[in-house]
């Protein structure tokens, strides 16, 4: 029975050594059984001498970065053990060891050197915020990495900007990808970054905030610059004075913003309100804590409200009052306009327009009708019914008679003599002026007599006598000299 591995694994040297020692005596087997029984009773420490007498090989050990099979037990003569290395390492020397007797009769391992696991290749380093280009690195090769955007490569040795793979599988002067280091934060404030992040790429902006009751002193925002330093020093949060309890209000209370009101720090706003049935005496109901004092500093009071809603009857009465007042105002304005108009009319009647009176003798007004000058009546004549329409010295014609000059009028010597005295020229003049006389008689009523009676209508005798007294147009009045009718062309 062997406490080890069976050496039949194809190793010629070990198989040859074992074949020479194949016969085993029964006495040796009994000795091993006896030794185990004594070890259970007295312990292995008291049987050291006996263990040496049994001729077993010492424990070969386990190489660093490796392991062996079997991992434990007692190794007697002809026992075999195997050694293995972890990934990335290789075993230096033989992987098998044989327990065999030397020439002096003692047992030992063949080969006798201790197994060693050496690193075959340099492992890929774990560099934060970097990408490794190659996957395997042999002895003497350089490490090639790319840092993430915003980070820069930094070497421990500033004079040796390269990292090489050593013989033992380790790296020399291993670099890192570095950004701006995490800045300090105030104990009374906070920043908008993760507590596990230690390096920040270029362009990162960190915002500082203070807890309520503290004021920020310094720059509020910090930026990571290209030289991997922050734009300014971290700010501080300084404690502010806390305002006292707001003034209490009878029949009311207050609420604060922001809530809850654990401390009345700088910037806290208090809003007052009254209980139902009460109202504030002032329209302004807010006060603000500013550097330990309330602003504005005034006392707030709540008084009982006495407001009553008007009834329907009172509302209608108020509406009618408004309508009546509006209608009365409109009527009064209209009455004033009418009175002003009447006063203006009477004023014009009593006070005629100013100006010098017209003189009919000095500056007569004439109208020429069919070549005959006709005097226009004055205002008084038109009102009183006067019909003196001819110019001075020309009496009004009656019926179909023609006007005659005053100087030339003479009663006929004999009745009916007007027919014989009238010349042909005078008859034509009478015919031409008869139309204008009829028009004037239609415009003006006949004048009243001095006694108040109308003149008697013209009789045929009168008409015939008047017709005979037709004035000649050639002598008497020079019409062209008195009134220019039309400017003739030369």
UniProtKB/Swiss-Prot annotation:
SUPFAM superfamilies: Complement control module/SCR domain. The gene is Susd4. The lineage of its organism: Eukaryota, Metazoa, Chordata, Craniata, Vertebrata. This is Sushi domain-containing protein 4. PANTHER family: SUSHI DOMAIN-CONTAINING PROTEIN 4 (PTHR47007:SF1). Residues 430-444, 461-475 have a biased composition (Polar residues). Residues 1-41 form the signal peptide. The chain crosses the membrane at residues 320-340. Residues 42-319 are extracellular. It is found in: Membrane. It holds the Pfam family Sushi. Keywords: Disulfide bond, Glycoprotein, Membrane, Repeat, Signal, Sushi, Transmembrane, Transmembrane helix. In contrast some authors report that SUSD4 acts as an activator of the alternative complement pathway, while having no effect on the classical pathway (in vitro). These contradictory results with human may lie in the differences in protein expression, in this study SUSD4 is expressed in bacteria and not in eukaryotic cells. Acts as a complement inhibitor by disrupting the formation of the classical C3 convertase. Isoform 3 inhibits the classical complement pathway, while membrane-bound isoform 1 inhibits deposition of C3b via both the classical and alternative complement pathways. InterPro entries: SUSD4 (IPR042985), Sushi/SCR/CCP_sf (IPR035976), Sushi_SCR_CCP_dom (IPR000436). The keyword Protein transport does not apply. The keyword Disulfide bond applies. One of its GO terms (biological process) is regulation of complement activation.
């Amino acid at each position: 029975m062997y406490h080890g591995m069976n050496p039949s694994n194809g190793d010629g040297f070990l198989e040859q050594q074992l074949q020479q020692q194949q016969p085993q005596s029964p006495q040796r087997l009994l000795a091993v059984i006896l030794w185990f029984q004594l070890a259970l009773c007295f312990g292995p420490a008291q049987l050291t001498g006996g263990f040496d007498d049994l001729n077993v090989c010492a424990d070969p050990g386990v190489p660093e970065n490796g392991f062996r099979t079997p991992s434990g037990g007692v190794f007697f003569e002809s026992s075999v053990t195997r050694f293995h290395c972890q990934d990335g390492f290789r075993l230096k020397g033989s992987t098998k060891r044989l327990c065999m007797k030397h020439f002096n009769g003692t047992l030992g391992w063949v080969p006798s050197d201790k197994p060693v696991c050496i690193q075959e290749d340099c492992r890929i380093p774990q560099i934060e915020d970097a990408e490794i280009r190659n996957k395997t690195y042999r002895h003497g090769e350089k490490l090639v990495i790319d840092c993430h955007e915003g980070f820069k490569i930094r070497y421990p040795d500033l004079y040796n900007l390269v990292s090489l793979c050593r013989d033992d599988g380790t790296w020399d002067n291993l670099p890192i990808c570095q950004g701006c280091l995490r800045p300090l934060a105030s104990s009374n404030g906070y920043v908008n970054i993760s507590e596990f992040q230690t390096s920040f790429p270029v362009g990162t902006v960190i915002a500082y905030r203070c807890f309520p009751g503290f004021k920020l002193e310094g720059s509020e925002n910090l930026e990571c610059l290209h030289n991997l330093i922050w734009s300014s020093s971290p700010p501080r949060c300084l404690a502010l004075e806390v305002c006292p309890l707001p003034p209490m209000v009878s029949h009311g209370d207050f609420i604060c913003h922001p809530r809850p009101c654990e401390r009345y720090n700088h910037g806290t706003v208090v809003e007052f309100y009254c209980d139902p049935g009460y109202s504030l005496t002032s329209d302004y109901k807010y006060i603000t804590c500013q550097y330990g004092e309330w602003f504005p500093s005034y006392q707030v009071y709540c008084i009982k409200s006495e407001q009553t809603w008007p009834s329907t009857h009172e509302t209608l009465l108020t509406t009618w009052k408004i309508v009546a007042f509006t209608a009365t105002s409109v009527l009064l304005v209209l009455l004033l306009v009418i009175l002003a108009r009447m006063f203006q009319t009477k004023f014009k009647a009593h006070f005629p327009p100013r100006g010098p009176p017209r003189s009919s003798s000095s500056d007569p007004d004439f109208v020429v009708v069919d070549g005959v000058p006709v005097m226009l009546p004055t205002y008084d004549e038109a009102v009183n019914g006067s019909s003196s329409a001819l110019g001075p010295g020309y009496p009004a014609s009656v019926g179909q008679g023609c006007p005659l000059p005053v100087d030339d009028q003479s009663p006929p010597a004999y009745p009916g003599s007007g027919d014989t005295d009238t010349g042909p020229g005078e008859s034509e003049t009478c015919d031409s002026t008869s139309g204008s006389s009829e028009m004037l008689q239609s415009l003006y009523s006949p004048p009243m007599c001095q006694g108040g009676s109308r003149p008697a209508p013209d009789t045929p005798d009168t008409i015939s006598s008047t017709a005979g007294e037709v004035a000649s147009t050639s002598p008497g009045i020079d019409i062209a000299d008195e009134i220019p009718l039309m400017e003739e062309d030369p």
